[in-house]
C-alpha cells in the first residue's frame, strides 16, 4: 500500500503506485494476478482496522517512465486504473489466495514440496512467456494446461 486517504464521507481510498514504461494496456488491466493485489489490500485493510469493506475504494496510480517522442498530441505522464473490487471479485480473489496458501504451505508453515502444481500455460501460453521452467524437462510442453 502506497497511499491511504479518507474523505469527508468516511470512504477510504487505497492507492498503489506503479511505474510502467508507457502505461498499462488492456491486457495488463485484465491480468487477474496484477489486479488481485489491490483487492487483497482492501480485504486485509478492512480486517485489520475494522473498516466496513463497502467503504473502501482502490486505485492504481501508474506513472509512465517514457512518452512517445514524436506524438502529435499532448500526453499524460500518469494513468489511473480502478480494478473490479466488488463482492464477487472479493470472494473470487480471497478463495484463490486461500487456496494458494493451503496448497503451498504445510500446517507448520513449511513449504509443501509434496503437492501437485500443474503447469497452467494460460491463453496463448502467456503464463509461460517469462517462466524459468518453460524450456526445462520439469515442465513438459505437452502436459501444460491450456485455458
Predicted regions and their residues:
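Non-catalytic protein-protein interaction segments used by genome-maintenance enzymes to assemble
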Residues: 1-39, 46
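Metal-dependent nuclease catalytic regions and adjoining charged, substrate-binding loops involved
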Residues: 31, 43-147
Amino acid at each position: 500500500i502506497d497511499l491511504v486517504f479518507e474523505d469527508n464521507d468516511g470512504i477510504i481510498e487505497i492507492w498503489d503506485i506503479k511505474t510502467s514504461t508507457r502505461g498499462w494496456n488492456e491486457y495488463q488491466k485484465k491480468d487477474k494476478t496484477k489486479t488481485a493485489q489491490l483487492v487483497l489490500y482492501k480485504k486485509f485493510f478492512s480486517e485489520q482496522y475494522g473498516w466496513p469493506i463497502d467503504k473502501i475504494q482502490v486505485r492504481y496510480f501508474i506513472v509512465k517512465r517514457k512518452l512517445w517522442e514524436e506524438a502529435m498530441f499532448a500526453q499524460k505522464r500518469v494513468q489511473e486504473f480502478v480494478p473490479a473490487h466488488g463482492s464477487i471479485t472479493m470472494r473470487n480473489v480471497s478463495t484463490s489466495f486461500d487456496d494458494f496458501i493451503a496448497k503451498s504451505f504445510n500446517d507448520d508453515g513449511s513449504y509443501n514440496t509434496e503437492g501437485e502444481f500443474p503447469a497452467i500455460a494460460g491463453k496463448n501460453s502467456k503464463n509461460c512467456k517469462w517462466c524459468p521452467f518453460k524450456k526445462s524437462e520439469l515442465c513438459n510442453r505437452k502436459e501444460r494446461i491450456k485455458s
